Amino acid sequence: MPATEKASAPHWSFLSSDVISIMKSNPSTLLLPLAALSLASCANPQKEETKRPNIIFMMTDDHTTQAMSCYGGNLIQTPNMDRIANEGIRFDNCYAVNALSGPSRACILTGKFSHENGFTDNASTFNGDQQTFPKLLQQAGYQTAMIGKWHLISEPQGFDHWSILSGQHEQGDYYDPDFWEDGKHIVEKGYATDIITDKAINFLENRDKNKPFCMMYHQKAPHRNWMPAPRHLGIFNNTIFPEPANLFDDYEGRGKAAREQDMSIEHTLTNDWDLKLLTREEMLKDTTNRLYSVYKRMPSEVQDKWDSAYAQRIAEYRKGDLKGKALISWKYQQYMRDYLATVLAVDENIGRLLNYLEKIGELDNTIIVYTSDQGFFLGEHGWFDKRFMYEECQRMPLIIRYPKAIKAGSTSSAISMNVDFAPTFLDFAGVEVPSDIQGASLKPVLENEGKTPADWRKAAYYHYYEYPAEHSVKRHYGIRTQDFKLIHFYNDIDEWEMYDMKADPREMNNIFGKAEYAKKQKELMQLLEETQKQYKDNDPDEKETVLFKGDRRLMENR
């Protein structure tokens, strides 16, 4: 019986008029038919509609599998993320279809690729009038909420309640962040990761208990510029993190795209915004400094703690004896210390939310999904950021807990994409999946211990558009199969790359055009053509060269 229905009074039409007359004259005889009815209902229970699951869609910004212990990462322990994986399923081959914040979010909402939903780059504005899975769930009786990072430069639609970060062009601030909440602008005091969780729990406390809910719980962290919570400032100051094997990649064996990017730890990380190598006195001398714009949002006691935490770093750098590879290694350590400290707060707050659901008795009736908008480079190839189709960026975390359908401790190698999330939510909610959604429901995988169905897709499709732009990552598209990857870089270059992901998981040696891979290359080219036709990406090589106009399109830190 749906939670919105109330039990109706018993119907007595099956009793004869004589029996009813006896019952009226001797009320105690009511006990007999009531007992009989009770026994009958136990023996022949009425068929009731299965209670529809709640949905909590947890998403962070720029979190990557290398920084999750449930994926075998050795950088940090994430016990609450691990709990979701251990009590549910971990997907090992989940891929973003356009590894950039706004486009990824649009693909997730619509279940469609960027060329279909119209949001191809971070300069786009999301057309909220189009079909999204929250709208469809809302129409089907779900109470819907969007809390945290939205980053689609339009008012959220399809939500009964929304409270989204509004500072820095919807990127949001870590400290005392601005929110746009149900049409009103407010400033919240505190740390963003904690505040977003407070807001999520507040929604759950005040929701309509007679409806299933779908809550999108989206954190800013661990996005650049990686500002830790006050309790985590300096927590990794004395930790030395292992370096990736290709931190000093020279890009031999690759083409111009890898060589001409602008996202290296060596050259692109800034001393102020990223590495935080400014004292308070230096920031106050030039209050137009970008770091000061976020530093000034902190309460004075947090500023004091910040100054103390970064004093050692500033002193080390100013000794002036760091050069070459030693300087790159040093920068890498500072980057990791800040990035991973922001992940700590994310994991702690996931624990808060799980504990609250357990407390109110809704944990096992809630589909809990944790993912990120894409992966991220943590020093691999000498890089930070995302955008490329290379593995650390294209691959995204996906762990799901729902004990009514998922066997605890399952893993899946099925090739999945973020366009699959929308049809999966609709499928579990009992809502018909529209025929124009391009993703596939993961329900058959989830209900079969992660096994790949026989008729499942052979490849994930990818298409990145934001060029020319910040970080100078060329436009490209391609496919990722279980064993190989094929990429075409286009626009102002025309270069192909192909990788054997089993023999070369770090993607160091381009094998496109190698005689020994000729047969496989032909197969992949054919599969790419078929995949583009399937997803209606009919003109992937369009040559637009002028993309970014106006202040918003020139903004950094997206």
Swiss-Prot record:
Role according to the record: Exosulfatase involved in the degradation of the glycosaminoglycan (GAG) heparan sulfate (HS). Catalyzes the hydrolysis of the 6-sulfate groups of the N-acetyl-D-glucosamine 6-sulfate units. GAG-specific sulfatases play a key role in the persistence of the major human gut symbiont B.thetaiotaomicron in the host gastrointestinal tract.
Post-translational modification note: The conversion to 3-oxoalanine (also known as C-formylglycine, FGly), of a serine or cysteine residue in prokaryotes and of a cysteine residue in eukaryotes, is critical for catalytic activity.
Residue numbers carrying 3-oxoalanine (Ser): 101
Keywords carried by this UniProt record: Hydrolase
This protein's name: N-acetylglucosamine-6-O-sulfatase
CDD domains, per the entry: G6S_like
InterPro entries in the record: Alkaline_phosphatase_core_sf, Phosphodiest/P_Trfase, SGSH_C, Sulfatase_CS
Molecular function per GO: hydrolase activity
Family: Belongs to the sulfatase family.
PANTHER family: N-ACETYLGLUCOSAMINE-6-SULFATASE FAMILY MEMBER, N-SULPHOGLUCOSAMINE SULPHOHYDROLASE
Pfam families, per database record: Phosphodiest (PF01663), SGSH_C (PF16347)
Top EC group: hydrolase
EC number: 3.1.6.-
Domain of life: Bacteria
